[in-house]
A protein has these predicted regions:
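N-terminal pre-Walker A segment at the start of P-loop NTPase domains
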Residues: 4-51
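Conserved ABC ATPase signature
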Residues: 66, 116, 135-228
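Helical segment within the ABC ATPase nucleotide-binding domain
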Residues: 227-238
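Phosphate-binding glycine-rich loops of NTP-binding sites
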Residues: 57-91
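H-loop/switch region of ABC-family ATPase nucleotide-binding domains
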Residues: 247-249
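Flexible phosphate/Mg2+-sensing switch loops adjacent to catalytic phosphate-binding sites
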Residues: 81-110
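Loop/turn-to-beta-strand initiation segments
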Residues: 208-211, 237-245
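Conserved small/polar residues in nucleotide/adenosyl-binding loops
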Residues: 263
Length: 264
């Protein structure tokens, strides 16, 4: 079962979103000529759970068990609304056909900064920082070796072809190892714990005046970080002109204030 609850706030862009109704999906299936697929995902995923329309508020929370359709609903909305996303989404051959059957009502134009943020985005970010720093560390060792070779090795200038080498030697001999290294490579990107990195990712990506869809943002966050994230999201809604729609299992995020609650 998929549920949702809303919190009224100061700024809303999306008023409601209509997913494909069962009769529309059934008509599409009757007209579909391709028979080589085992699944027509996302067809019948949401209508089979009774979700054909979602009325949104300034803060809308989707919750339910695994497989209830939370992530599917958010991804369909993000694609239909042309929101920014980082990690690629695995679309099925029937995705475009499904999107054509969806519609929505806006209260305000959706800002260009609006985006969907998924668990994959956060994990990819942490892996990227780690890989970047590993690359910098390897490059630093190479620079150390170059410095020692240029500073203390034997060198004779014999032709203009040696000019670049002469410049490197002079630079090494006129600088300390630390200064020589800083000039040639970037600084490491600061790494935090997984929980702090995840929390910082959300605070970096969620700005002012935007529509943000969050898919299980509690992943990788400790209970204390989940509570901190809930306060940040509420402040973003109340004071920063944000509309937020999120799917979650977290009791800390589910505990955020909601003015109405519906079972669908």
């Amino acid at each position: 079962m998929l549920y949702y609850k809303n919190k009224e706030g100061s700024m809303e862009y999306l008023e409601s979103f209509r997913f494909a109704a069962y009769d529309q999906e059934y008509a599409f299936r009757l007209d579909e000529k391709r028979t080589c697929f085992d699944s027509m995902y996302p067809f019948f995923t949401l209508s089979g759970r009774g979700l054909e329309e979602l009325t949104t508020g300034a803060l809308t929370i989707l919750y339910g068990g695994n497989g209830s359709g939370k992530s599917t609903a958010l991804n369909i909305m993000a694609e239909k609304l042309s929101l920014q996303r980082e990690s690629p989404y695995n679309r099925s051959p029937f995705y475009e056909g499904y999107l054509k059957l969806c519609s929505y009502d806006l209260l305000e134009k959706v800002p260009a900064c609006s985006r969907i943020i998924t668990s994959d985005d956060v994990f990819d970010y942490m892996l990227h920082v780690r890989a970047l720093n590993e690359g910098i560390d390897i490059r630093r060792e190479e620079v150390f070796r170059d410095y020692l070779t240029d500073k203390y090795g034997q060198f004779r200038f014999t032709s203009m072809e040696d000019l670049d080498k002469l410049k490197r030697v002079n630079k090494a001999r006129s600088r300390t190892l630390s200064k020589y290294t800083r000039e040639r490579i970037a600084h490491n990107v600061r790494e935090y714990s997984n929980g702090e990195s995840g929390f910082r990712y959300f605070t970096d990506k969620i700005g002012e005046d935007g529509l943000y869809l969050l898919d299980e943002p509690e992943n990788s966050l400790s209970p204390s970080r989940q509570m901190e994230l809930s306060r940040f999201l509420l402040d973003s809604v109340r004071y920063c002109g944000c509309q937020i729609i999120l799917a979650t299992h977290s009791p800390y995020l589910l505990a955020m204030e909601g003015d109405r609650k519906s079972v669908v």
